């Protein structure tokens, strides 16, 4: 309050709210500024207006948030198969971001966070599903490898480094990072080495699970500022992880055996029934019956399993699914190579038998969809090396003989018949 106004007040002159005109005696509090006054009632009214506007903005965001059906439809464009996993993810992600909107309301019901566990073999699409979700929702996204994490104080990455990576993805915008998605891969590799708690320190197994617990559940993580390293005198960025969606995934090799041990009560000795591979059925069918107790027996600590209420199992990809992956998604490998060759002014054709041969090879290697690019890179290496220096090539044709290594890719030259690249050999 200025000296004149203080004198006015001291001399007994009444002061009035500049907004509603009420005197200082009609309100509980009158706040003074430079040449202006505002009463507590007007402050409360302003707060109500701001709160209503924030709720309207939240509703507008809700309109933009894709519905579960729309989320699944977009996932279908990039990921082949895995329908049940897509449905589970679509519902979980939709509910997570609806939960963020609910924070602005005065409702007493607080919605809990539902982090997600993805279980599926290598190359089944776990990482791609998480990446596609983040791109669809336009939120910061980062991938962390659980095998590189150790407890604080040991050589390796602290769990806080995950949040630092997320901050880097959004130029250290803390508000934006607090609504991001984190995917932690290879989570099965930090399982406890034995079913019973160990008396020795397990810095990359149970210790990391303990360190991840608070981060996943929700805590205030202290992260060094941009480009900084941790030291005692440094000011840290405070990131609230309560609203960050954590998706963790792993292959969980051997989990199917743990599930079968629980579900199949066979006899002992000569009366025991030994089932063939065909009778056991596909591993993915067994994994779909996973229960929290199976994950605990596998080596995840009970508290960690409890922080992952949504569990989605992915199926092992068969040959037909791998062929679809090669051709159908928006960013299918055959389309990517088509674009690369188009930049050289050349068309590339993958025959049907070539696609089947690539899928069969990936099945043999047990690498899933991840192995498809490796196979095509090996097959096309020499062609991609020579093509920029070769003139008059209009088309490259790949058949099953090329994939099996029995022939080199066929080159079609302008105004000529098929000529094998190896014709001069």
From Swiss-Prot:
Binding site for ATP: 121-128
CDD domains with a match to the protein in the record: RecA-like_ClpX
GO cellular component: HslUV protease complex
One Pfam family per UniProt: ClpB_D2-small
Binding site for Zn(2+): 17, 20, 39, 42
InterPro entries tied to this protein: AAA+_ATPase (IPR003593), ATP-dep_Clp_protease_ClpX (IPR050052), ATPase_AAA_core (IPR003959), Clp_ATPase_C (IPR019489), Clp_protease_ATP-bd_su_ClpX (IPR004487), ClpX_bact (IPR046425), P-loop_NTPase (IPR027417), Znf_CppX_C4 (IPR010603)
Family to which the UniProt record says this protein belongs: Belongs to the ClpX chaperone family.
Protein name: ATP-dependent Clp protease ATP-binding subunit ClpX
Organism, as annotated: Thioalkalivibrio sulfidiphilus (strain HL-EbGR7)
